[in-house]
């Protein structure tokens, strides 16, 4: 199925390319999830990230991060998109909210990441 969003199409192509070059299955898995219809993309609240992530960990969300709940841990969250309240709360917890494109550039091997959906 073709995507109408040029950003999402290029992100999927980049994820597949990096996965092929580095052998990182995590990026291939994220690309496969993003290729599916948007209604199946993850919508993850901060409370879920708080529950399952460890301190100073990188969390990958193949979808959107929403601002419901509190985040007290300093984590790096990489996602396709963030609600404004989620990005604010992540930064107040001394964390970092980055887009998936940046996460792929920083960690092409996909090591030490946790996918939450």
From Swiss-Prot:
GO terms for biological process: translation. GO terms for molecular function: RNA binding; structural constituent of ribosome. One of its GO terms (cellular component) is cytosolic large ribosomal subunit. Keywords: Ribonucleoprotein, Ribosomal protein. The keyword Zinc-finger does not apply. PROSITE patterns: RIBOSOMAL_L18E. It comes from the Archaea. PANTHER family: 60S RIBOSOMAL PROTEIN L18, LARGE RIBOSOMAL SUBUNIT PROTEIN EL18. This is Large ribosomal subunit protein eL18. It comes from Halobacterium salinarum (strain ATCC 700922 / JCM 11081 / NRC-1) (Halobacterium halobium). The gene is rpl18e.
